[in-house]
Amino acid sequence: MVKVIASSVRKGNVLDVDGKLYVVLTAANFHPGKGTPVTQVDMRRIVDGVKVSERWRTTEQVERAFVEDVNFQYLYEDGEGFHFMNPVSYDQVVVDVETMGDQKAFLQEGMTCVLSMHEGIALALQLPRHVTLEIAETEPVVKGQTASSSYKPAILSNGVRTLVPPHINAGTRVVIATEDVSYVERAKD
């Protein structure tokens, strides 16, 4: 464990508070006109998923847990959760549905992801910045609708909705940014 000042806590950090591990969801520093500056932190307890809000003076010491980011390859999903394998040591890790969150829609078999590990437990998952998916369904283009840079709604092969340029049709493979589900470019494969 490393002691850090509260004002240096950022989203994604893992903190040890009273012997329990928490993942930081949001952290904001407030400097009121009167009084001492404070850091407001919203966290999720790793063990049971309970959300907690804490307020510390910005100079107060908090314990940050050691977290290691390791590359893992996605294998499959079953009733236990999502199975990943370390391509170097061949160790397998199961990630639960709560840790996975909304990112599960973008998982593809064999995809390399970064898992944040603490004592053999996966705390968080980072997908690649871009994934290539096929357009399953999109609306036809309305002729003459070129006055503004128009995008049309589309449904990807994984069921996620996004906006694509008018020249993209169903069956076209496109590159999508996983962070905000936005269209990047037409796939070059």
Swiss-Prot record:
One of its GO terms (cellular component) is cytoplasm. It is found in: Cytoplasm. The keyword Coiled coil does not apply. Pfam families: EFP, EFP_N, Elong-fact-P_C. GO terms for biological process: peptide biosynthetic process. PROSITE patterns: EFP (PS01275). Pathway: Protein biosynthesis; polypeptide chain elongation. InterPro entries: Elong-fact-P_C (IPR015365), NA-bd_OB-fold (IPR012340), Rib_uL2_dom2 (IPR014722), Transl_elong_fac_P/YeiP (IPR020599), Transl_elong_KOW-like (IPR013185), Transl_elong_P/YeiP_cen (IPR001059), Transl_elong_P/YeiP_CS (IPR013852), Transl_elongation_fac_P (IPR011768). GO terms for molecular function: translation elongation factor activity. Its main location: cytoplasm. Involved in peptide bond synthesis. Stimulates efficient translation and peptide-bond synthesis on native or reconstituted 70S ribosomes in vitro. Probably functions indirectly by altering the affinity of the ribosome for aminoacyl-tRNA, thus increasing their reactivity as acceptors for peptidyl transferase. HAMAP family: EF_P. Belongs to the elongation factor P family. This is Elongation factor P. It comes from Rhizobium rhizogenes (strain K84 / ATCC BAA-868).
